[in-house]
């Protein structure tokens, strides 16, 4: 042990500690300064940044033996407080930088050191500084962070005040404004606790959990020996599948088959704890409960698992090979099939080869790369309910998925969403919920389970890769006539939502264009790679890797400008254009979208031409185009509920299970309810939020597929309308709480929104024809790239995006979602993948983008076509920026070099290979 005297946030502290502890452990575990986060644990992400003796220090890799005695350390808690914020913190709120908020403390720390030493940095210097400090953000795309730092610098130079930065409400409506999300202040001051922070603050007697996990991808389990582990220091119990079954559980996750007609599985392939087979690397085999996390992890490694290793099928094509064994005996590896059959058959021999193309494409196993590792905790609440806190974005959805598996009746199960440090969809699937719930039931003690980043990357779900074979045909003028496709989706070893995902290929391949004949077959395949989970834009990135590259190839073959061919074929009411599933879109807005985009495209072409004219040929420049369309909601009839309650003090409490990835659910509830509540004189600050607890909030459905603004937004609107209607007197004034009670009127009202109109045209499981979504989002992507022909490195220098997501409810949120989604799309196109289990196990190795990898020049334009079924005319927005940026980037590479790449990521070696092919 060593003794250290440190000045932390201005206070002298005497600490007795282990010399091998890291600084972040001391700050968090000893002092509960949880504004300092643990993301990667390897010094790659900057979430743990603190200031030590005036320098930025990555505290997760800084051993206490290296910390000088009497060092002065500042954490985010010492930068500013809720009542006295630093200008950087105010700017972070004003520019919408705190989306999930997990990275905010580390960035603010870095920005403070920069501005303390360089009060007038350029934008390039700010980006370089953040890059040097290894600051990562997965939500914002970095541009708002640079904007905020520049604004804070102006305040610190005395050129403006903090008050100048803050949004000032001028009318009684906040729709379409930059109103700051309610959680922003806590996020920028380090007081917004995430799951691992909560876990540190649980009561004494809380047991810490660790998992024994598979180290191979496919094997039979012959024996599990827990004897040695059970005798290790601090261990209370080792739980295996037999314990779950003894406690009344089936030990199976319910994968919720959504489209049963052509599904060859019942959805129960995934065990809570593996006892017979291992299906993927990282599968959980045992849960160790101990007094400390260190003891639990040591014992988890001591559990002996005897296996018979089996051939591992790591992609769909290997898994459907004739000699491939069934991963789940009795169920074919190709377990689901859907066909999009629209319009009449097309005679492909009726048109010349010059008017048709065929391509093969591959969309990769993109990892979510959220900075906060998966985490959660559980306990038995005051009513005896098994309570699980996690990052779930489907708290009501996950209850039926895990209840029988752990032997807990639904009515005795409660799920609460933690403040989540980003999910981007992976938490649509349960990850730790059943493990925590089973441990609480068996141990009857509070527990916590916190993954490290290695576990987070290797065990949680990924975007399902898709191999696509697409044909497109057009008439002599470029008018699209037909689309044919044959596609395979690699969904990993578990079926959950695989059918729904694969149906998306029917719904989005060729979307945006009035194609009268479509024959598009898609097959879902079990493999032994990471299980497929939802990822932002769910199903559409795979679809557009096929159709948006195919239309570009067709345009080039026919000598038509790629923008022109898309504009020519976009949905037009005058032509009666229909979506791939056979029905008209809810609004015809694409023509106006292309009109808005046309001058931006022409300007981009001019810039690119000028750069190429000035280049020596080593760097080649190009402009790409793509069109993306995404439907908001779950297929068919969808529903959401919310409560609005008038309180004695005249405030209103909104109860909503609108789960938050970081996209801004708190702001969504606030603006969707306030727009109605303002009629009764309720101000935004008078609206209280109770969110994301199955015990207190009605079922609103999961936060996925950009459904929340439409579904939950409407539910909040209706709840507010019902409350306001009850408050309203005949003379037009409004009752107080006391008057409501005196008149015997209820003070709490429910809002229920149901897309009953979708029941009129349900999806036909044989043809995929139907009208499944309440509303759609439309986006044109225009990236400008620079390709280094000697190294193969591609840089997106500017990204212009033109979108229509209906009424913009909060501009900060919508713009922030687009900035972040576009940069995730750049990662998908150029760098990100999870394929090699010996390499792709860290944020850095998976290809996450740092600030200098993303463009600083991102230009957003929005048309706001009113959506009849959206609250106040709004659609969703979260999926839109990531549905088709990647094919646009690949199309830009072609425009620059003539090299056509149809597989992502287009890493330098792939680009170089394509360039060399041109020389043959």
Predicted regions and their residues:
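Signature of N-terminal electron-transfer/Fe-S-associated modules in redox systems
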Residues: 1-168
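Intrinsic disorder at enzyme termini
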Residues: 2, 132-195, 604-611, 645, ...
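Short beta-strand elements
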Residues: 50, 186, 192, 196, ...
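Glycine-rich loop/linker segments at domain edges
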Residues: 96, 177, 183-189, 256, ...
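Flexible, low-hydrophobicity surface segments
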Residues: 154-331
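C-terminal catalytic domains of large/alpha subunits in multi-subunit enzymes
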Residues: 242, 255, 407-412, 442-447, ...
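Phosphate/diphosphate-binding loops
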Residues: 291, 445-489, 714-738
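Helix-loop-helix junctions that connect adjacent transmembrane helices in secondary transporters/permeases
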Residues: 324-406, 570-651, 842-861
């Amino acid at each position: 042990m060593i003794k250290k005297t440190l000045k932390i946030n201005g206070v002298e502290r005497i600490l007795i500690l282990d010399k091998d502890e890291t600084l972040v452990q001391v700050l968090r575990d000893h002092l509960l300064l949880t504004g300092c986060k643990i993301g990667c644990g390897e010094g790659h992400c900057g979430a743990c940044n603190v200031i030590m003796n005036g320098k930025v220090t990555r505290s997760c890799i800084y051993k206490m033996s290296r910390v000088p005695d009497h060092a002065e350390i500042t954490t985010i808690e010492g930068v500013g407080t809720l009542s006295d914020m630093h200008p950087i913190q105010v700017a972070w709120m004003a520019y919408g930088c705190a989306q999930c908020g997990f990275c905010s403390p580390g960035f603010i720390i870095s920005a403070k050191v920069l501005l303390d030493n360089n009060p007038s940095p350029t934008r390039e210097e700010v980006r370089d500084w953040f890059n040097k400090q290894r600051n990562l953000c997965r939500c914002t795309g970095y541009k708002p962070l640079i904007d905020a730092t520049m604004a804070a610098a102006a305040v610190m130079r005395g050129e403006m005040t903090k008050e100048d930065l803050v949004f000032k409400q001028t009318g009684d409506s906040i729709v379409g404004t930059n109103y700051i999300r309610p959680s922003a202040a806590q996020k920028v001051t380090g007081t917004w606790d995430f799951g691992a922070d909560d876990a540190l603050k649980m009561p004494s007697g809380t047991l810490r959990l660790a998992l024994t996990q598979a180290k191979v991808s496919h094997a039979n389990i012959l024996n599990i020996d827990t004897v040695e582990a059970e005798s290790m220091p601090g261990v209370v119990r080792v739980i295996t599948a037999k314990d779950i079954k003894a406690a009344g559980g089936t030990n199976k996750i319910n994968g919720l088959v959504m489209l049963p007609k052509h599904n060859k599985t019942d959805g129960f392939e995934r065990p809570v704890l593996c006892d017979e087979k291992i299906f993927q690397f990282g599968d959980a085999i045992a849960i160790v409960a101990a007094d400390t996390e260190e003891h639990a992890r040591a014992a988890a490694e001591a559990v002996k698992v005897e296996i018979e290793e089996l051939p591992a099928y790591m992609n769909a094509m290997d898994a459907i090979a004739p000699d491939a064994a069934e991963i789940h005996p009795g169920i074919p590896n190709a377990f689901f099939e859907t066909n999009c059959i629209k319009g009449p058959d097309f005679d492909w021999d009726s048109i010349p080869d010059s008017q048709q193309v065929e391509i093969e494409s591959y969309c990769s196993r993109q990892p979510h790369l959220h900075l906060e590792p998966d985490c959660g905790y559980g306990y038995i609440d005051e009513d005896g309910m098994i309570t699980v806190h996690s990052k779930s974005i489907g708290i009501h959805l996950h209850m039926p998925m895990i209840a029988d598996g752990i032997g807990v009746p639904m009515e005795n199960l409660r799920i609460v969403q933690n403040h989540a440090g980003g999910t981007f969809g992976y938490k649509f699937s349960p990850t730790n919920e059943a493990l925590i719930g089973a441990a609480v039931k068996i141990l009857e003690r509070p527990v916590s389970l916190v993954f490290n980043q290695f576990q987070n990357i290797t065990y949680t779900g990924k975007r399902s890769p898709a191999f696509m074979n697409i044909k497109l045909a057009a008439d002599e003028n470029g008018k699209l006539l037909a689309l044919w496709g044959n596609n395979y989706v690699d969904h990993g070893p578990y079926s959950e939502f695989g059918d729904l995902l694969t149906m998306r290929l029917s719904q989005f391949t060729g979307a945006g264009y009035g194609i009268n004949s479509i024959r598009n077959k898609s097959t879902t395949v079990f493999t032994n790679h990471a299980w497929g989970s939802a990822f932002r834009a769910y199903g559409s990135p795979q679809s557009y890797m096929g159709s948006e590259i195919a239309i570009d190839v067709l345009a080039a073959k026919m000598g038509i400008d790629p923008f022109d061919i898309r504009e020519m074929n976009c949905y037009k009411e005058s032509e009666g254009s229909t979506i791939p599933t056979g029905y008209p879109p809810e609004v015809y807005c694409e023509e106006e979208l292309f009109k808005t985009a046309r001058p931006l495209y022409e300007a981009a072409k001019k810039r690119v031409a000028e750069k190429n004219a000035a280049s020596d040929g080593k760097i080649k420049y190009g402009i790409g185009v793509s069109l993306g369309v995404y439907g908001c909601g779950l297929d068919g009839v969808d529903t959401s509920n919310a409560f609005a309650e008038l309180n004695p003090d005249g405030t209103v409490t909104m109860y909503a299970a609108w789960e938050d990835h970081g996209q801004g659910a708190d702001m969504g509830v606030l603006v969707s309810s306030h727009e109605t509540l303002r009629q009764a004189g309720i101000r935004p600050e008078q609206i209280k939020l109770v969110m994301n607890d199955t015990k207190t909030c009605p079922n609103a459905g999961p936060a996925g597929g950009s459904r929340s603004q439409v579904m939950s937004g409407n539910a909040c609107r209706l709840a507010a309308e019902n409350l306001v209607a009850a408050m309203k007197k005949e003379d037009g004034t409004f009752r107080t709480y006391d008057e409501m009670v005196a008149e015997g009127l209820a003070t709490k009202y429910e809002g229920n929104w149901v897309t009953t109109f979708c029941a009129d045209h349900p999806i036909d499981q044989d043809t995929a024809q139907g009208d499944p979504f309440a509303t759609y989002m439309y986006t044109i992507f225009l990236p400008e790239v620079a390709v280094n022909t000697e190294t193969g490195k591609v840089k997106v220098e500017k990204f212009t995006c033109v979108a229509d997501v209906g009424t913009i409810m909060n501009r900060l949120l919508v713009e922030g979602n687009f900035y972040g989604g576009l940069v995730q799309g750049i990662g998908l196109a150029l760098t990100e993948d999870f394929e090699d289990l010996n390499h792709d196990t860290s944020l850095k190795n998976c290809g996450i983008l740092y600030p200098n990898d993303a463009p600083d020049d991102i230009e957003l334009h929005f048309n706001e076509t009113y959506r009849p079924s959206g609250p106040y005319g709004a659609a969703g927005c979260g999926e839109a920026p990531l549905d088709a940026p990647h094919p646009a980037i690949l199309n830009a590479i072609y425009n620059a070099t003539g090299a056509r790449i149809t597989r992502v990521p287009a890493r330098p070696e792939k680009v170089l290979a394509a360039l060399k092919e041109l020389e043959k």
